Swiss-Prot record:
Belongs to the four-carbon acid sugar kinase family. Keywords: ATP-binding, Carbohydrate metabolism, Kinase, Nucleotide-binding, Transferase. This is 3-oxo-tetronate kinase. Gene3D superfamilies: Four-carbon acid sugar kinase, nucleotide binding domain (3.40.980.20), Putative sugar-binding, N-terminal domain (3.40.50.10840). The keyword Transferase applies. One of its GO terms (molecular function) is ATP binding. It catalyses: 3-dehydro-L-erythronate + ATP = 3-dehydro-4-O-phospho-L-erythronate + ADP + H(+); 3-dehydro-D-erythronate + ATP = 3-dehydro-4-O-phospho-D-erythronate + ADP + H(+). The keyword Nucleotide-binding applies. ATP binds at residues 254, 354-357, 397. Catalyzes the ATP-dependent phosphorylation of 3-oxo-tetronate to 3-oxo-tetronate 4-phosphate. InterPro entries: 4-carb_acid_sugar_kinase_N, 4-carb_acid_sugar_kinase_N_sf, NBD_C, NBD_C_sf, OtnK. Its EC number is 2.7.1.217.
Length: 413
């Protein structure tokens, strides 16, 4: 059984959707469960909020997740992080990878965030978003993890205790045996991690074969999909659900390039309310005002949207005025409390944009786990809470096409 430790919520639902699509029955747990799993599945995904919190917390959470997965029958483990890496020199990917390797008594693993279907590719160890380097993409303006270097070896070496080598494209296309030879060569030279080039899915397929016997694999959801395909014998997932029509709200906290486009497009069709950060910080009645506005607009043709999404210049101004931490906390807290009030009112469908926003909303709603439904876009499935008929679409910042919010609602039964 495959056990996945994901460093944020949207990342967890991202990989869970690819596992289901490729034939593995999968359950997604919100945080480390306190009880044993009582259903039979092929894979378990645990979502943590460990991407940008203090490193000791990230390690502690990840090791607890690993322990629970092991106790519940998992024999191979996958540390899932974002396809844009989202980890600076002070980041947690290196330290968590090291802690998991030590716990498993292993001394080598791969670093493969590639997700070609969404334009995330690796060549010569450099991570690309579409046709530009990660460091020249919108990710350089990320409010919490600005990505100013695209070289994955340097990024990993800056935050991990070992050395990072490269398995280059020219070797990967020779097949799994050659990739395994490269691993052996790197290990002999004292390397602890290998960045593996992948410019399209065929390289991920090769890599899935090459790491079939690894106890720990790390990467984005792309490699996970091909590992699932191997484990399931090429089965395809069936019977994925879509939500029932009901009261719906859109909550957008991401400031990514794509989410800005999605918000702009959706504003043309739906009632929308831009969250005011100063009000969120200082006005204790602000959540009530937002709540009243949303419920007044719930009968619109398209769901009302509350958004904190702004372009890079406006984001910098907000961060300069209020501080990064205070602004982020105020926005997340506002969305979380608003979501809780709306659920109480009878909203059953939540569409959220942004990893931090999604994580905090799910925590506030208090669900322990999710069934994985139909994909809205690659890496973004509909989820259904295990406790009740509440449906969520949790979108990582740059995922989805420009009509994402409208398209998601078009899937209602």
């Amino acid at each position: 059984m495959l056990g996945v430790i994901a460093d944020d919520f949207t990342g967890a639902s991202d990989i869970a959707s690819f596992l289901v699509e490729n034939g593995l029955s999968t359950v997604q747990m919100n945080g480390v469960p306190t009880q044993s799993l009582n259903s039979k599945v092929d894979a378990i995904v645990i979502s943590l909020k460990s991407r940008s919190n203090p490193v000791n917390e990230a390690i502690e959470q990840s090791l607890r997740a690993y322990q629970w997965l092991k106790e519940n029958g998992c024999t191979q483990f996958y540390f899932k992080y974002c396809s844009t890496f989202d980890s600076t020199a002070k980041g947690n990917i290196g330290p968590v990878t090291d802690a998991l390797l030590d716990e498993l008594n292993e001394d080598f693993t791969v670093i493969t965030p590639a997700l070609p279907v969404n334009g995330r590719t690796i060549f010569n160890g450099y991570l690309f978003v579409g046709d530009v380097l990660l460091s020249e993409s919108g990710m350089k303006n990320h409010p919490i993890t600005p990505m100013v270097d695209a070289n994955l070896m340097r990024l990993m070496d800056a935050q991990a205790k070992g050395k990072t080598g490269l398995v280059a494209y020219a070797d990967v296309i020779k097949g799994a045996s050659r990739v395994q030879e490269c691993f052996a060569e790197l290990k002999a030279q004292g390397y602890r991690y290998a960045v593996v080039d992948a410019v399209d899915n065929s390289q991920l397929e090769v890599l899935a074969e090459a790491v079939a016997d690894f106890k720990l694999v790390t990467g984005g959801s792309g490699l996970g999909a091909y590992m699932a395909a191997r484990l399931s014998g090429g089965k395809k997932g069936t019977n994925a659900f879509t939500p029932t029509k009901g009261k719906t709200v859109v909550l957008s906290g991401s400031c990514s390039v794509m989410t800005n486009k999605q918000v702009e497009k959706y504003r043309e069709k739906a009632p929308h309310f831009q969250l005011d950060v100063e009000q969120a910080i200082h006005n204790e009645n602000y959540i009530e005002q937002l709540y009243q506005w949303v419920i007044a607009n719930l009968d619109s043709e398209f769901a009302p949207m509350v958004y904190a999404t702004v372009p890079p210049d406006a984001l910098k101004a907000i961060q300069h005025q209020f501080g990064v931490d205070q602004a982020s906390h105020a926005i997340e807290n506002t969305f979380a409390k608003l979501a809780a009030k709306l659920k109480q009112y009878g909203v059953t469908n939540f569409i959220t944009a942004g990893g931090e926003t999604s994580s905090i909303v799910v925590q506030e709603l208090g669900f322990t786990g999710f069934h994985i439904g139909k994909q809205i876009a690659p890496g973004v499935p509909w989820l259904k809470a295990v406790e009740e008929d509440i449906f969520l679409a949790l979108k990582s910042g740059n995922f989805g096409k420009e009509d994402f919010f409208e398209y998601a609602q078009g899937m209602f039964l």
